[in-house]
Amino acid sequence: MARFPQLLFLLLASIGLLSAAQNHSDSEWPLHDNGLSTVVQWDHYSFHVHGQRIFVFSGEFHYWRIPVPGLWRDILEKIKAAGFTAFAFYSSWGYHAPNNHTVDFSTGARDITPIYELAKELGMYIIVRPGPYVNAEASAGGYPLWVTTGAYGSLRNDDARYTAAWKPYFAKMSEITSQYQVTDGHNTFCYQIENEYGQQWIGDPVDRNPNQTAVAYMELLEASARENGIVVPLTANDPNMNTKSWGSDWSHAGGNVDVVGLDSYPSCWTCDVTQCTSTNGEYVPYKVMQYYDYFQEVQPTMPGFMPEFQGGSYNPWAGPEGGCPGDTGVDFANLFYRWNIAQRVTAMSLYMLYGGTNWGAIAAPVTATSYDYSSPISEDRSIGSKYYETKLLALFTRSATDLTMTDRIGNGTHYTNNPAVAAYELRNPVTNGAFYVTIHADSTVGTDESFRLNVNTSAGALTVPSKGSIRLNGHQSKIIVTDFRFGPSHTLLYSTAEVLTHAVMDKKATLVLWVPTGESGEFAVKGAKSGKVERCPQCSNATFTRKKDVLVVNFTQAGGMSVLQLNNGVRVVLLDRAAAYKFWAPPLTDDPFAPETDLVLVQGPYLVRSASLSGSTLALRGDSANETALEVFASKKVHTVTWNGKRIKTSRSSYGSLTASLAAPPAVSLPALSSAQWKSQDSLPERLPSYDDSGPAWVDANHMTTQNPRTPDTLPVLYADEYGFHNGIRLWRGSFTDAASGVYLNVQGGAAFGWSAYLNGHFLGSHLGTATTSQANKTLLFPAGTLRKNTTNTILVIHDDTGHDQTTGALNPRGILAARLLAPSDSSTAPNFTQWRVAGTAGGESDLDPVRGVYNEDGLFAERMGWHLPGFDDADWPANNSTTTRGAQVSLSVTGATVRFFRAVVPLHLPRGVDASISFMLGTPAGASTAYRAQLFVNGYQYGRFYPHIGNQVVYPVPAGVLDYDGENTIGVAVWAQSEAGAEMSLDWRVNYVADSSLDAVRVAAEGALRPGWSEERLQYA
């Protein structure tokens, strides 16, 4: 930048901008509440809870994607430890309503009250999102599948049939939540109505022509919430910047909620980025989106609120193994979340923060078993660099109280002396504290840029640093603070190192700053006169320069942690990125605001979950993944430290901290699956003409009409949901007596579905499936000798659907759209089927297994009979000749085109006092056919769908609680060979990680009630 423009900037900054900021009054913006309570309020700047502004940094987790309540604590403790002030969750109507007369919030993992209680205990607010439609890459968007037949109308409207369907669930969800609101001393602070339902307008929202059907629907939902005790603000989330729905700042057309927000996925919600071009435009990595003007236009008297901001991406069928973590990794977290602050966002929730698993039939057809989502907390519950990077910002937003009330003063490259770098200035109009969000002027560029920044402070206009420069190396952003308040009465005039957190101990302040490894930083503290280096193992060039009443400190941090002591009592901890990753600030209170007077600071471990103080003893809970040095900054009255209940030997440093060493966790090994006794049986007897389908497993498929908007091409109606069978594999037996030469079948099951057909036990053919095909037809000719003369012939169609489509596609039927016999060669008249029968999940909608629930099982013979369940007696099964061993692996073989079920009982005995995660690995040996489908069962839970000819997922995490870590485990695999070549599949397992932990995974896994066993009622479903 030329000298004259720089001087002009400094003059404007010191006169005009400062004046504008100081003259801006809080009273210019109205403070809102909903008329029911003033505990939660909001204005242009932020949410208020109990009269205090809060920066809401939240993240999403789905309890129904990890059906082990004992592990919910693990997830929520990790969210809290990272500095988040809140978390959000979708409920799932379908998970709680197996049929249209049952709403279950009490059985097993359907009891959600522990989530609310944990939020209170841990000190986090909750954003509850009950639907009734949630999307979430869940089958039918979370709808119960009995609502997808057409009998309840087109859904998501005010149709009386649909209203009668959702009301019992929604009322119960509201009633439960009403007991846990901030208005009653608990932690639910807002309640979302519907999900991404941007339907308020007909045509262009600018015309404000209301969609009265949508308005009526929203008003019904809002009334139900209020009638059932919800008094906290009701919210809604616009799916994009084009819909502008449900906010009173935009219109009073009807159906409005209290606070509206905007969802955004700037790098695409799926690894297939082409799916997002209609919303985001052409995908360009690291291209940020502008939100500031949207919030100013659409919701100016409400906070910048993002109920969903991209936390990762789901992996579609045929997506890369392991997803696409590189698309939304460490750099994404660093850049985009800071960018939102530049856009004056003060409430955002990451979707997802923990993704979990699409176990059973939970998923919509868009994705496979894994819902890892490349989230900060991985599917196997491990944490890594993305989690730690996100923690750096979350801890900052929790401690930066001025950030909850800022005006955007300006932005552009004129703030810096490098045209490649821009800054966005946010300033608190009351305190004058400011935040300069620096970023490459072109966010898609990741060059290494050095610059100095023009800032406006209480000491005047400055260009910082005074020595050296600030660096943006790669796709990075930095938030430079000025007049940052911390401690009892201290002011950080500026810092080119980012603030991590600050705490007050014994009435003295500790300020924690960090820089990327090897970079320099400069900060200035008002009121300090001198300082000294207490610890500096890898720092260099630490200098202290007094300028009037300000002490300027310049340093370079090569690695690790340094400690400085200023003469005014302020202790400054300097960290490089790696050290900052393992730096924690656990509160000593359950207050979500985590006041600085109630914090301790801890350096070193993999995870610090919590801290509590009793007398002179500080109790820390957490995880150590290896031998680790521990350093604790706490009150000087602390003389004893315990780690996970055990006292550890500590030493006090010269600067007052306590140091110790944590031992490595014990090694954990798994028994080889190849050493287990594997047995197998054929699981497709239904293909044989001798099979008896007269039992209760089977239902006559004889409907001649349907309310589904998709009329079938032939009758009877062969839509599985019409007959109460909703999940995965269903079987159809069609009978005929007259001669025929073949059959035409058109089957629909969603992307990646497949089907096979048999005549009188003879294999006719299969649709193997593709990642994008949701419907497939085939004309199958009958081979000579397969027809039976003068008696009944039976066609079996086995089809596997991958869930119901989302949004308006929820009603797309699953089953056979057309079934026509072909005329024999000596006739022009095609015969007709005389009967169709269908089988699916044992018991249909009656929910034989309410603990695992209706999503868990399909209609395979093995599942109906309960072969996958613990306690099933396979003693009379013959010795298996369909398995071989390859080292620790077991290889499961199927001869011909059929389904075979393999099972073994494998003991586990993990040590106590550790957390461990285990995954199964499924694969296809080299040279073997991939034309098969497989399902993995662990203690009765279906925890993996493996389609090697379509998808690339080969690693399947299975949580403690589904696995028994100190007992016997029933492992089952159903292998469906879709060609005469048969199939061969390899199976192994591994330990993902082990940590010495306060979370005793063996104890969590001991909850046997989550693993109910086999019962004789299964026998009737043969």
UniProtKB/Swiss-Prot annotation:
Which cysteines are disulphide-bonded?
271-324
At the top level, the lineage of the source is: Eukaryota
A GO term for molecular function: beta-galactosidase activity
Q: Does the keyword Lipid metabolism apply?
A: no
Q: What is its EC number?
A: 3.2.1.23
InterPro entries from the UniProt entry: Betagal_dom2 (IPR018954), Betagal_dom2_sf (IPR037110), BetaGal_dom3 (IPR025972), BetaGal_dom3_sf (IPR036833), BetaGal_jelly_roll_dom (IPR025300), Galactose-bd-like_sf (IPR008979), Gly_Hdrlase_35_cat (IPR031330), Glycoside_Hdrlase_35 (IPR001944)
Coiled-coil segments:
none
State which residues carry a glycan (glycosylated): 23, 100, 211, 411, 456, 541, 554, 626, 777, 790, 832, 880-881
Where does the secretion signal sit in this chain?
A: 1-20
Which UniProt keywords are given for this protein, alphabetically ordered? Carbohydrate metabolism, Disulfide bond, Glycoprotein, Glycosidase, Hydrolase, Polysaccharide degradation, Secreted, Signal
> Where is substrate annotated to bind?
90, 135-137, 195, 265, 373
SUPFAM superfamilies to which the protein is assigned, alphabetical: (Trans)glycosidases (SSF51445), Beta-galactosidase LacA, domain 3 (SSF117100), Galactose-binding domain-like (SSF49785), Glycosyl hydrolase domain (SSF51011)
Naming one, the record's GO cellular component terms include:
extracellular region
So where's the catalytic machinery, residue-wise? Answer: 196, 308
One biological-process term from Gene Ontology? polysaccharide catabolic process
Q: Which reaction does it catalyse?
A: Hydrolysis of terminal non-reducing beta-D-galactose residues in beta-D-galactosides
Show the SMART domains listed in the entry: BetaGal_dom2
| Subcellular location field | Secreted
Pfam families xref list: BetaGal_ABD2 (PF13364), BetaGal_dom2 (PF10435), BetaGal_dom3 (PF13363), Glyco_hydro_35 (PF01301)
What does this protein do, in the record's words? Cleaves beta-linked terminal galactosyl residues from gangliosides, glycoproteins, and glycosaminoglycans.
Give the family from UniProt: Belongs to the glycosyl hydrolase 35 family.
Q: Which PANTHER family match?
A: BETA-GALACTOSIDASE RELATED (PTHR23421)
Name the UniProt record assigns to this protein: Probable beta-galactosidase B
